[in-house]
């Protein structure tokens, strides 16, 4: 069984919990996921099954989109509402101040990963150090906020934001920084990933739906999966003749092929996806 299963991750599950559950449902250990989600977060988690797992590191679109809730009045050690409160302060700002500062967070910037993260220093994840009460210096990393928008206030001192950003962005840190720019203490009280690359909430299935499909048979389960070719939809398509197909399977370079320089997704004459090909015309 091969394909990409877009899972709607439930809250209080780690991304690895989802993989472990799917290994039981699908009966295979050959699974990989793209973009770890914190346990409190929900939403889009692409899982690559079988041979499709080779495509995890080949994705072309690494942008992510989120819907997050900023809660003013307190700051926690984890940057979200699951953590221990470190500071509290009266809330003296609101919607106006939020709207004033949001434009300043759009664009390329440097962001320091939080201690409660999977980033490794000297081979050890930061979150393990944080649990021992150890804090170490972390290097800021380049990120980009492509879009950020205020969506409303679900409760007093809470503000819902939608964010589209580059890979590696920590929304918890972003919300803390937004609160600080407002002159407030703040933390993230909810987070949902609404898209990961090409994949959106509309593509996602709950674990219950996946299990129900499995009980109906492999055909129903495979119907939930997206083809591995979907990862490369933005690449131009190249349809090759049988002799070229055989060359590609054998790992042989093929000369004199009528296509411009570049990277292509390749199908055979029957429409079967074969893989990727790089064409370079020597001068």
Report each predicted region and the residues it spans.
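Accessory RNA 3′-end/elbow-binding domains used by RNA modification enzymes
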Residues: 1-10, 16-33, 37, 41, ...
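Glycine/acidic-rich beta-strand-loop module
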Residues: 30-60, 128
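Residue-level signal for inorganic ion chemistry
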Residues: 47, 68, 123, 174, ...
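Acidic, low-complexity central loop/insert segments
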Residues: 58-110
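Long, charge-rich intrinsically disordered scaffolds of nucleic-acid metabolism proteins
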Residues: 100-126
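Extended alpha-helical targeting/anchoring segments
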Residues: 117, 121-147
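Pseudouridine synthase
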Residues: 118, 125, 157-201
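Helix-hairpin-helix/helix-loop-helix acidic hairpins
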Residues: 142-159
């Amino acid at each position: 069984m091969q394909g990409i299963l877009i899972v709607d991750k439930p809250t209080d599950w780690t991304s690895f919990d989802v993989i472990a559950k799917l290994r039981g449902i699908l009966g295979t250990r050959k699974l990989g996921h793209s973009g770890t989600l914190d346990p409190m977060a929900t939403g889009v988690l692409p899982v690559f099954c079988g041979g499709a797992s080779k495509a995890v590191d080949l994705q072309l679109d690494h942008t992510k989109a989120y819907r997050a809730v900023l809660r003013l009045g307190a700051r926690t050690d984890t940057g979200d509402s699951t953590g221990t409160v470190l500071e509290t302060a009266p809330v003296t700002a609101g919607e106006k101040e939020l709207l004033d500062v949001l434009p300043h967070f759009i664009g390329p910037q440097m962001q320091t990963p939080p201690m409660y993260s999977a980033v490794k220093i000297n081979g050890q994840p930061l979150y393990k150090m944080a649990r021992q009460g150890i804090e170490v210096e972390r290097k800021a990393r380049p990120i980009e906020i492509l879009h950020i928008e205020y969506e409303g206030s679900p409760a007093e001192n809470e503000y819902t934001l939608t964010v589209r950003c580059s890979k590696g962005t920590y929304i918890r840190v972003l919300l803390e920084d937004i609160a600080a720019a407002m002159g407030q203490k703040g933390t993230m009280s909810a987070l949902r990933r609404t898209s990961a690359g090409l994949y959106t909430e509309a593509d996602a299935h709950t674990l219950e739906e996946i299990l129900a499909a499995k009980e109906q048979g492999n055909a129903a389960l495979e119907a939930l999966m997206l083809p591995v070719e979907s990862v490369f939809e933005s690449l131009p398509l190249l349809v090759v003749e049988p002799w070229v197909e055989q060359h590609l399977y054998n790992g042989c370079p093929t000369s004199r092929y009528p296509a411009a320089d570049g990277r292509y997704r390749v199908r055979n004459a029957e429409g079967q996806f074969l893989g990727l090909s790089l064409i370079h015309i020597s001068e």
